[in-house]
Every structure is written in C-alpha cells, then in structure tokens.
Amino acid sequence: MRRVIQTEVDVSLEKDGYILAGKVDLLLGGDGKLELLDFKTSPRPKDSPELIAAYERQLCTYAHILERRHGRHVDRLLLYWTSEPLKEDALMVLPYDPRRVEEAGQHFDDTVRRIQAQEFEVKTPPEAAICKECDLRMLCHAEGIITREARG
C-alpha cells in the first residue's frame, strides 16, 4: 500500500568540490519500498523521447542523492502529468536502473569538472529560436562562442 512520506523534499549531497541539490515533489512508501514522484504540469508528451530521458535523469539524480546520503534504496521512479484528464494517462512509471542512477551522479561530476577547468566549448549550437530568446546571446556573439553564421 502506497502512502505519502513527504512532499517538496529538499535533497542534497556534498560531492568533491560542490553540492548537488534538488527538490523531490513527492516521496511515496509502503511495504518497505520507496518511490520518487515528480509532477509535470504539461500533458504527457506523445512523441518526445528526449524530454522523457531528461526527466528520467532528473529522477535518477534524486535517487543518487538519496542513496548516497541517506542509504535509502529507491524502488520506482514516477512522473505524473497533471494536465492529463485520465489518471491512467497521467501516471508514467520509469524503469529503475542502478546504472542510470550512477550515470546521473557521474554526469554532474563531469559537468562540474569541466566548469572548474573553464571548458566552455559549445560542441552543438542550439537552434536559432533558442538563441533568440537567450539572455546571454550577446556574450556568445561577442566572445565568438556561438555564431549564427556557423549554424546556417
């Protein structure tokens, strides 16, 4: 039987040279199991594996923090799409894979290492529409980090 353990849970983990922090929307438990649920206010995407993968990484990062800091094994990762009218369409169960949880933690270690080493090379420029809305677009242009001419 699933029950709410806690809502809006601040989680953090002191790593080598930085603190990894996040906020879990909902911790569920029961029968010795622990589940992480994240609410999404949009409808469930019909064809966006990249978006689902990003949300899975988010939940795996939370699982990494809980497992490393508190020794709590996470059993399931859940997304709940609040704009879906039907409950069966709203709840999405993501597969729990301990390797993905470890990769999520490693991703932040690698990113922080690159930031600390001042490795800011942009390997794949974003779409022009993203740059158009970005507050840092003038810096990119002035520093030659991203040029729209290179994108085509």
Locate predicted features:
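Short amphipathic alpha-helical face segments that pack within enzyme cores
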Residues: 57-65
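Hydrophobic (often cysteine-bearing) scaffold residues that line and stabilize catalytic clefts
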Residues: 55-58, 104
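Short, contiguous acidic/charged loop-to-helix segments that flank catalytic cores in large enzymes
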Residues: 46-54, 96
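Residue-level marker of regulatory loop/turn positions in helix-turn-helix DNA-binding domains and
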Residues: 15, 51-54, 123
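Well-ordered beta-strand positions in beta-sheet-rich domains
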Residues: 21-23, 56, 93
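Catalytic cores of nuclease domains that cleave nucleic-acid phosphodiester backbones
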Residues: 1-46, 72-76
